[in-house]
Amino acid sequence: MNTEMVLNKIDELSEEYIGVWESFCNIESPTSDKAAVDEASEYILSFARKKGWDITESIQSVSGNAYCITMNADSAEKPVCLSGHVDTVHPKGDFGYPPVKIDREAGKIYGPGVVDCKGGIVSALLAMTALSECGYNKRPIKLILQSDEEISSISSDKKTIEFMRDCSLDASAFLNCEGYSKGKLVIQRKGIIRFVFDIKGVVVHSALCYNGKSAILEAAHKIIELEKWKDRDGITCNCGIISGGTTPNTVSENCSFVADIRYATESELEYVKKRVAEIAETSYIGGTSCSVSVKSERICMEKNERNMNLLKRIREIFAKYGIADVEPGGSNGGSDAAWMSYYGIPTVDSICTCGGSIHSKNEWAWLGSLADSAKMLASVAMEI
């Protein structure tokens, strides 16, 4: 058995696993619906049980359960870990029924999670199946199913992240199966921190508005300050949710808004926290007060030598087997890969199906990218 045999087996299995991809994505699994997320995970677990692979679980009361599937669990070698999240962002029914559509003529599949991130899970499952059917038994290969990634693991209080860490600490490589950007594998990602600003003003009738202090007006000033952060490679801010006021003829006493701030380095995060505190403490119109709290946080994935060395080895493997070369890439979006990198595990992100319009009702992927990404994963698992 050799790597070429496994890559050929992936081609043989590709059409069958396009069907798996379709069926998996037809099981809609918004993060907030635990039963739906668990149902989607169970679909993948059913394949593992049939193949006799080991399954460990992290049972959650609010979020979906997280799982780790292991083939070759008896091997003493260091494992390679593959990972993807089962949860998606849209409520059930947003894509119509059935949610997934395949356009063979265009070579595309459309639906919730076809790229982010169910496509990645299926490509990992395809890679593992090909390895298993070709008799590969050298090292453990793990597939970790995350359940609340889309909301930064708030609902599990980061317990799913801890589970991922515990399953991966001894890994020779952690390959996160987020959406693939053609020609690049991600080795650095921005962190995300979301702040809630709660502003209190002075309420009066709008006929006497000059005697009041509008919480909405104060929020506007604060938002203008925050939204000055628009550095593509550094700090950015988007204030995407706001609520306040009671009636049109009342000066608003209360206003709340949420700021989504992204940063590239830990030093930038420290600056963000300091500046946010200053903006919260400053009353731009006078006579208002403001409290600020952290709603959620996801750490950044900083570029480091450990991950660069892993990428270098991956490129050597790809060159050996005629797989298209990749370059180091970055992303402004958050990912659980950042946590694994933080814990010292050699990590590369975005080895997955390739497509576009992620998080929209037009999310799509190239059908051919399923086999392509599975070959990437399988070759690394064997040769790293």
What are these regions, as identified by a protein language model?
Residues 81, 142-144, 238, 291:
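A structural signal for isolated positions on well-ordered beta-strands in alpha/beta enzyme cores
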Residues 80-82, 144, 173-175, 346-351:
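Hydrophobic/aromatic beta-strand patches that form the interior of the parallel beta-sheet core
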